[in-house]
Amino acid sequence: KDGTVRHVFYGVNPLGIRVYPYGKPTDEEAKHDFLWRLHVNTPKKGMISIFNRSYYEDILVPTVEGYIEKDLIERRYDHINNFEEMLRDNGTIVLKFFLHMSKDMQRERLDERMEERKKNWKHHASDEVVRKKWEDYMEVYEDVFKKTNTKHAPWHIIPTDDKWYKVYLVAKTI
């Protein structure tokens, strides 16, 4: 994801772009609603905000891990659709990209991270744990696409096994 941002926005004035990586919510973020941490980083007029991961993680992980009730997940879908519509109503163009890597390619890249010294820093023990739930995550992603693909914020599903083609498709879409 970081490499895609670097390649696509190479040569663009960095003063107009902010990239926000999201992981597990911090203690402070957890004190607010699940959209808060992203809402505070939405772009000002004329600016670009790039979210590396996003509020969709707050549907994916709890659904796969089973620690939030189904009705709350369904309400989160509604909140997300309303949030994205509000952004559009206020002049923000919402582009959503799902960078899809095949399971075989993911295995290959995870192995590279272990074998190549210069890529070791990218490896996390949790990668293997999450990988074991591949099918569960793909099932939830399908649900996410069905429930949040809207006219004002459509999904763009980008194949990523070929890095150059991924960069081309993202740049072309933008």
Please report, for each region that a protein language model flagged, where it lies by residue:
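Glycine-rich phosphate-binding P-loop
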Residues: 1-9
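Conserved catalytic network of the ASCE P-loop NTPase/AAA+ motor domain
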Residues: 12-14, 28, 40-44, 86-92, ...
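Conserved nucleotide-sensing/catalytic segment adjacent to the nucleotide-binding pocket
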Residues: 14-77
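Loop/turn-to-beta-strand initiation segments
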Residues: 18, 45-48, 91-95, 154
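Residue-level signature of catalytic and energy-coupling elements of molecular machines
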Residues: 50, 97, 158
